From Swiss-Prot:
Organism from which the protein derives: Drosophila melanogaster (Fruit fly)
Subunit structure: Component of the WASH complex.
PANTHER family for this protein: WASH COMPLEX SUBUNIT 5
Protein name, as recorded: WASH complex subunit homolog 5
Pfam families for this protein: Strumpellin (PF10266)
UniProt keyword list: Endosome, Protein transport, Transport
Amino acid sequence: MSFLDDNNACGQNLLNIVSVGNSIIAEILRLKDYVPSIYRLDNKADKAKYGELILDFSYFKIAEDHERRIEQSPELTELDDEARAQLPLITRFYLAFQSIHHYASDLQQYIEELNTGYYIQQTLETVLQEEEGRQLLCESLYLFGVILLMVDFHIPGDVRERLLIAYYRYSGGDATPSGDESNIHDVCLLLRSTGYVHPSIAAKVLGLGGKQAGARAASLVVPRYPEAYFSRFRFDENFVDLVVARLRCDDIYNQLNLYPHPAHRSTALSTQAAMLYVCLYFCPQVLHSQGSQMREIVDKFFCDNWTISVYMGMTVNLVDAWLDFKAARSAIENVISPPAIKALCQQQKEQLGKITQKTQEIVREGVLNDNFVLEHANKIIHLMRQSNVLLRWFCLHTSREVFIFAHTATLTGQVQKCVLHELQFNRNTLYNLLLNCSQMELSVREFLAEIQQTKEERWTKSREEAMQRLNELSEAFAGSRPLSKIEQNPQLQQWFGEVAGRLQKLELSRPQKSGRLIIQVMQALDDVQEYHNLHSNMLVKQQLQETRDMLNQMAQLINLKEDIEIHIQMITDFSYAWHLLQFDFTPPMQEHIKRQPQAVIGIRAVFLKLASTLEVPLMRINQARSEDLVSVSNYYSTELANFLRRVLQIVPETMFSILAKIIYLLTNVIKEFPTKVEKERLKDYAQFEERAKVAQLTNSIAVFTKGILMMKTTLVGVIELDPKQLLEDGIRKELVNHLANAYNLGLIFTPEKGKTPVQLLQQKLQALAKTIEGYRRSFEYIEDYLRVQGLRILLEESQRIINYNVEKECNAFLRNKVQEFQSEHQSQIIPIPNFPPLLGDPSNNFIGRLAHEILRCTDPKQTIFLDLKSTWYEKKAPHQEVLAGSGFFEILREALAPAGMVGLERLYAHMLADELKRNLERLQRNLTSDRMWVDTLAALTRELEARDFPTPEVSKQPLKYYQAYTQRWLKVWPTLLDWVLCIGQKQLLRREIAGELSFSSKCDAKLLENTADTLNKALLLELSLSKDLCDEKGVVMLTELQETLLYTGNFEPLEQVFLITKNTHNMALFMFLFTIAHLGRMQHSTITDCLLPKSAKDNIDNVPFIVGLVTILQQFHKNVKMLYISYMSQYVVTVSEAQLLDKEILGPEVVTALHFLLAFIRIARLPLGVLEQRIPNIILSEYEYLSTLLK
């Protein structure tokens, strides 16, 4: 029974453990990009905001005090709730950390089971005697070491501690989501911070300099690393010793058979060498003191190389890694001595020139075909082996290692400088070898695959043709076939007939017998030709040569083994370049494409070479038939596909640099043809030279397009990449970068001398509109040459950028924030760039800056809004126009498109919701809890609702009566007024945005606007009659329709309800008192026919004041609004009666109140009948006459 048979529990359990190890590594690599920024605390803003809340393991010492501090601080409580919202993501991190500990525990348990005889007839020694068992046992220990290194490299120790503490605090730490008991204590002990610093952070620290440079450099040194880290989990010593011994002495993967040349020994054992390197950290005494063993290891595995790939391109330099290990350091120093390096580099340099030339000759067009591959298969594989060995050595030893242990050590750098100097290294030479090697491998694989598929057919065809020629010769020597000058020869007739008969019996399924017979026949043909002097007749000689060719082809087909492709796969391993290719070869690739767009064909071969390495992490997962296969293969394939996109991004980048020139010419130089033009003026629009320049630039773009489209559809892992889609994605990505940059730079509002904020705002918007129009015209012009739908792409991407930035800006008002990876507008393939906020600016991005700038320009404290003209004016005389609503919002739409208008509206809506929530909660709390408020309002309610109100005392001086109540909140009114005006201002802006969207949609998208409006009315009618639309499908449809209605401006901002409130009549009464307390600060203007502040210095503005009140009351039941109007009407009637009885004339208080009420019901869209029911008609209709003094 095989070790990996399904019935062999011992083998299957070990295979599953190793499979899980590979899956854990993929999960760590996947999660490293999703660490929430607040747990990194790598900038001052996050440290200041979350530093007190998010702690590392120091939390355990002050847990109770920490929790008490959070409970006592509302700010910390709110931040804690915000951080708690990320628990699902934190849980995934914890499960990944826990799986690391589970992996080690499962492996330890498996070893114990082997030692205790749990598996029948299986012990540690017998498993190591099995080929598969030996490989898997070594891999199991090696993978745990790789996991530890990977997690420490990609997720820093302090970040791990903060994530573990967050999980402990927010989940309780007692159980995992699956219901298993949590072992968080063991996980914390294993993954606590080691002190290791990532190379990128270490480089920044070392680059700072200054007085404390020495101290900072010392902080980067981690003693006994990674020895102490690996010792946190103890495995059975015998198991570790046996694994290290097998790795040291055996060829566990039988690689030496594939690399027979002694110079290739270190490459043959490279995978085993990496495993041995990791496993030695589990028995550090060998590294420290076993000098003879270390010399043996170095002589066998590292005699000509000192940089190794540990796992999927995670490279390590042994000079750096073994610096703190005496025996290991001593052993490796022999390899890196200057004479040894010089000799080795000289040899490799010579080989590089020879192999590059050979591969160049092979990949030259017209050389490689199926017959060439069939004939020279062994020579080609030998060349592949040589070129890959050379490629591996140069890639690893001319690049900086990925994992750096000693950041302050100088020896590593000295060795690399020496190598580069001796090699006189040129990266482009190595790049050419890589290209040749990749193209050769791809072509040979394709030909071999084709040959293997048609092998039976080729064999049969060759045999039939050989038999046919032999039969023809037999007939010719019989005299029945009249070939010129051939004498009849019965013996040759019989012999050729017998040979043809023997060939008939050949079978491809019996290669040894058939091969021997073919060789015998070929030898016999040579002997016959020589003996009978048949070469004197050219026709016979030609027949015999063609027969030999057919037989030779049959022999080649027999010799072509089925496992040849597996051998090629193994000798062309490129997994060591997973990281190096991105760091070192991206610039040469992009420069190559820039010079020759058709170079993408060769670069495709490079990526297919790299894609073949996905077998390394997937092999064991696939063998175990694990469910993780899809997710792991998808991760690596996505990473590789994204890398290919990054390399090919040079094509869109170059296109856009050319397109920028076209944009300039089309926008600023070339005149747009009018619909009609006079014949005499036609020359003015010709502009031959400028149009020739545009044509030349357009041709350059077309060449790049053609180049990338020459690349075939490519399967990268499990992801298929279509060149047309790659081109479109690249164009989208570059367009997104340009548009995002244009929005970001175009909407920075720095004060300029001689310009008001409004002038600067309009100027910026007009400039931005011109830029966007330039892109529109250019894409409209160029889309046919790019073979994409340019205008659709421009519309979709600009809309996505705006929606993404609106979402980010709105996050400030959300407790459960939308994370970067959760955003439906963000994309891994076409990412929207993030720009840092401006210093001292409360906004997060350009949409927030624009929203705040518009608010600044329309501040009710500085401006007056005239509703009839939709225009803002200065409060100070001479009341100049500040911002004309119709003209300004048209400019805004041209600059940001409808998507930007809708985005602004959404942002203002979020601001309103946040302000209403905070202030209404506080207001309602006071209305229900504050003794003075409750008692005063209760007393006033009883008096106002009494049957005998107004009493004689009130009737004499009603204003004094009301004033007595309003003065009780004198300290509250200023704050409340600012809030109401702020709400009114934002609602006014939302209303103006809706108006502009409605107007533009009626002009530019009349059919859409009409259709959406009709559907909306139909659905409203349907909802009023039944609840059929309240199911899931109905809600989805209503949501989609709401989105369309926003874009067509078919919505009423003042009717929107932002939050759920408790209804109370006290709210109506309080808002009534607030209103009458401020009416005296306004007066009616006959010029503008509206209320204006009496003083230019007064902060109040009538329309925002009313709109703010309407919005607040809209959050309650409509009865609250009606009650508010009733109180206001009662106030008007009461004061009117008193004034008419006293002076027979209405005072300004009543007139102002009536103008206010009429404006209120108009803005609130209420019928006039609401007032007619509450105020006598004589007052309502004749108040202007009744307030006029008669002479």
